[in-house]
From Swiss-Prot:
SMART domains: Knot1 (SM00505). This is Defensin Tm-AMP-D1.2. It comes from Triticum monococcum (Einkorn wheat). Disulfide bonds join C3-C49, C14-C34, C20-C43, C24-C45. Belongs to the DEFL family. Plant defense peptide. GO terms for biological process: defense response to fungus; killing of cells of another organism. The keyword Disulfide bond applies. Keywords: Antimicrobial, Disulfide bond, Fungicide, Plant defense.
Length: 49
């Protein structure tokens, strides 16, 4: 199962999964990707749980 948490450090709209994943790694998550959240794209960090 995968758990997602919105990144606390990522600022602004998320257009690059690579940038999102890099920020997530600084938050101790192994990966991250952009997901649509209402009208904005946000960076969500993922880990196995």
């Amino acid at each position: 199962r995968t758990c997602q948490s919105q990144s606390h450090k990522f600022k602004g709209a998320c257009f690059s999964d690579t940038n999102c994943a890099s920020v997530c790694r600084t938050e101790n998550f192994p990966r991250g990707q952009c997901n649509q959240h209402h009208v904005e794209r946000k960076c969500y960090c993922e880990r196995d749980c």
